[in-house]
C-alpha cells in the first residue's frame, strides 16, 4: 500500500549548500516560536527520567530553552507548576491518559501550565483524542502537544481534535526497542516518516527520536519539523538525573527508555532498554555546541534563520555519508 513512499533516514541524506549571505555564523538566528513563546533553539531534551528533572527544567527555562517535564512523578507536577510560575517561568508538563489524569487536568484551572504534552507510545488512539478535547475544554489557553504518531492520518486526527502540535516518531530512539518487540514503528525511516507526516500537518510537528548528530537537527527542519526532541545527545551529562556508575575507573550515566522495566518498575509490556553512556561534561556546553552547529547549518543553507533550512535541496546517498567512518 505504501510502497511508493520514499524510504530513508538521517544517515541517508545530505543537504546541498547554497551561497552564504552572512559574514559570520554568529549572525544566524536559531530561535523558534512555539505558541506564544520564543525559544533559543528548536530542540527539546526528551521528557524522560534520565534526561530531565526539576532542576534541569528550571535551568532550561531560565536560559530561554523549551523543555517538557516528564510525567513519572505525578504528585510533584502541581507544586512544580506553582514553583515555576512564582519565578516567572513557563510551566511545561506531561500527562498520560488514565482516568485519574482527567481529574488532575481539571484541578489545574487555578494555575494552568503554559504547555501540556500528552505522552504515550501510540498516540493515534481514541484515548489521546479524548484527552486533547478534555484539556482544551478545561484549560483553553494551554498549548497542547500530543503524540507519539507516525502517519499523516494520525497527525490530522490529533490536530482536528484540538492538538496545537504533534510529536512524530515511534521507536526510532536509541533506548527504544518498539520496532523489535512489536514489528511496528518509524525506526530506520524516521526522517521519511517525518516528511510524510509534515505534508499533512497544518500545525507544528515535533520530530522525536533517531537524532544521533547535530546535523540531524537541520535535516529534521528541512523535512518539516518545527522542533526536535532528543534523548541520547542530552543524556550522560554531569547534571543528568541518570544514576552515575563507575566501570573500570571510567564514569558512566544510566540512560533508559520510558517503556523500559527500569522506568515501569516491572517487566510488563517492555519496549525500552537501559544503556550506560560515558559522562560527557555539562549540559550548557552541549547546548552551546548545538547552537553553533545549527548556525553553521543556516550559513550553508544560504540564509539567516531556520526557515532557510526548509528550502535547500538534498540528495539520498543510502548509508554512505560516513564513508566507513564514525563520529
Swiss-Prot record:
Q: What is its EC number?
A: 1.7.1.7
Which family does this protein fall into? Belongs to the IMPDH/GMPR family. GuaC type 2 subfamily.
Question: Binding of NADP(+): at which residues?
Answer: 205-228
Species of provenance: Streptococcus pyogenes serotype M49 (strain NZ131)
- NCBIfam families (UniProt xref): GMP_reduct_2 (TIGR01306), PRK05458.1 (NF003966)
Q: Which UniProt keywords apply?
A: NADP, Oxidoreductase
Transmembrane parts of this sequence = none
Q: What is this protein called?
A: GMP reductase
Q: Which reaction does it catalyse?
A: IMP + NH4(+) + NADP(+) = GMP + NADPH + 2 H(+)
Q: Which GO terms describe its cellular component?
A: cytosol; GMP reductase complex
The reply on keyword Cell inner membrane is: no
Q: Which residues form the active site?
A: 176 (thioimidate intermediate)
Q: What superkingdom heads the lineage?
A: Bacteria
The UniProt function text for this chain reads: Catalyzes the irreversible NADPH-dependent deamination of GMP to IMP. It functions in the conversion of nucleobase, nucleoside and nucleotide derivatives of G to A nucleotides, and in maintaining the intracellular balance of A and G nucleotides.
Q: Which PANTHER family match?
A: GMP REDUCTASE
Q: Which CDD domains match?
A: IMPDH
Instruction: Please name the SMART domains in this protein's record.
Output: IMPDH
Q: Which GO terms describe its molecular function?
A: GMP reductase activity
Family matches, as Pfam families: IMPDH
Amino acid at each position: 500500500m505504501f510502497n511508493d513512499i520514499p524510504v530513508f533516514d538521517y544517515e541517508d541524506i545530505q543537504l546541498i549548500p547554497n551561497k552564504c549571505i552572512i559574514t559570520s555564523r554568529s549572525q544566524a538566528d536559531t530561535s523558534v516560536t512555539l505558541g506564544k513563546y520564543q525559544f533559543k533553539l528548536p530542540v527539546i531534551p526528551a521528557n524522560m527520567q534520565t534526561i530531565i528533572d526539576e532542576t534541569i527544567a528550571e535551568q532550561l527555562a531560565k536560559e530561554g530553552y523549551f523543555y517538557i517535564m516528564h510525567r513519572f512523578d505525578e504528585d510533584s507536577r502541581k507544586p512544580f507548576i506553582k514553583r515555576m510560575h512564582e519565578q516567572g517561568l513557563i510551566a511545561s508538563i506531561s500527562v498520560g491518559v488514565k482516568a485519574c489524569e482527567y481529574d488532575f487536568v481539571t484541578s489545574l484551572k487555578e494555575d494552568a501550565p503554559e504547555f501540556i504534552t500528552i505522552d504515550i507510545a501510540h498516540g493515534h488512539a481514541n484515548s489521546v483524542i479524548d484527552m486533547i478535547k478534555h484539556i482544551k475544554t478545561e484549560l483553553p489557553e494551554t498549548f497542547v502537544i500530543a503524540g507519539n504518531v507516525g502517519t499523516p492520518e494520525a497527525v490530522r486526527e490529533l490536530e482536528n481534535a484540538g492538538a496545537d502540535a504533534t510529536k512524530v516518531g515511534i521507536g526510532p530512539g536509541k533506548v527504544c526497542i518498539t520496532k523489535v518487540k512489536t514489528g511496528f514503528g518509524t525506526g530506520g525511516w524516521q526522517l521519511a516518516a517525518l516528511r510524510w507526516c509534515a505534508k499533512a500537518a497544518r500545525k507544528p510537528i515535533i520530530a522525536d527520536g533517531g537524532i544521533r548528530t547535530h546535523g540531524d537537527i537541520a535535516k529534521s527542519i528541512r523535512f518539516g519539523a518545527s522542533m526536535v526532541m532528543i534523548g541520547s545527545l542530552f543524556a550522560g551529562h554531569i547534571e543528568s538525573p541518570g544514576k552515575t556508575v563507575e566501570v573500570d575507573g571510567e564514569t558512566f550515566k544510566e540512560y533508559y527508555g520510558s517503556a523500559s522495566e527500569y522506568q515501569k518498575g516491572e517487566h510488563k509490556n517492555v519496549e525500552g532498554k537501559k544503556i550506560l553512556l560515558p559522562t560527557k561534561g555539562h549540559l550548557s556546553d552541549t547546548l552551546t555546541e548545538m547552537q553553533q552547529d545549527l548556525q553553521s547549518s543556516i550559513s550553508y543553507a544560504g540564509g539567516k534563520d531556520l526557515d532557510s533550512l526548509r528550502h535547500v535541496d538534498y540528495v539520498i546517498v543510502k548509508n554512505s555519508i560516513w564513508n566507513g567512518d564514525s563520529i
